[in-house]
C-alpha cells in the first residue's frame, strides 16, 4: 500500500523499457502515469578514437579479428580450450580485453600455458604472427570493437550477467553472447529477435558459430547491419523525456 501511494504521488513515471513500465503498473502505479520513454543509453552515440583505432590497426595488420570483450575469470580458460580444438580451422587473431586490468598478466599466462603466442597492446608490436593480442589498455574498447570482425561480449559465460552490447551494435559489429545476460535481458532479446546477435550456451558452440560466420560473409555483414539498425531505431529517449518534463512543468 505504501509503495502504491508513493508511486501515485509522482506526476509521471518514465521507464526505460516496456518490461519496467509493466512492473511499475503491477506495483500499483496508475496506467496513465506510466510511459515507456526508451533507454537513454541508445542516445550516447559511442564512437572510437581515430588515432587509437589507427594504432591498433597497425598492430593487427589487416587480419581477421575476433574480440572477446570484458571477459571475466573462468571465461578465458573456456574460450582458449575451445579455440585450441579448432585453431587450425580459424585464420584469425584472437583479442582478449579483460574486464579488470589487474587480470591482464593472468590472462597472458593462461594463453602462454596453452602454447599460444601472444602480443600485448602496450608493446605496440605487430601481431601478424601471434595467436592472441592482449588488450592491456584502458579506455580503448571502442577502438577494439572498430577493428573487429566479430565481437563476443564477456560476463555471459559465467554468472556476471553480461555487459553492454550497444557499443558494438552502434559500430555495426556482429555480436555473440553467452547464456547469462540477465543484466541486458531486453536488449539481448531484441538483438536476437532482430537477427542482430547470436546467443550460445557454451564456448564450444561459440566457436562453432564463429566458424560459421567466417565462412559466410553475407551472414556476417547482415548481423552487423541489423545490429546498427536496431541501435538507431531505439534512439530519441532523451528528447522524449525532455518533452515529457516540459509538458509537466
List each model region and its residues.
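Nucleotide-activated sugar donor-binding and catalytic core shared by glycosyltransferases
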Residues: 1-249
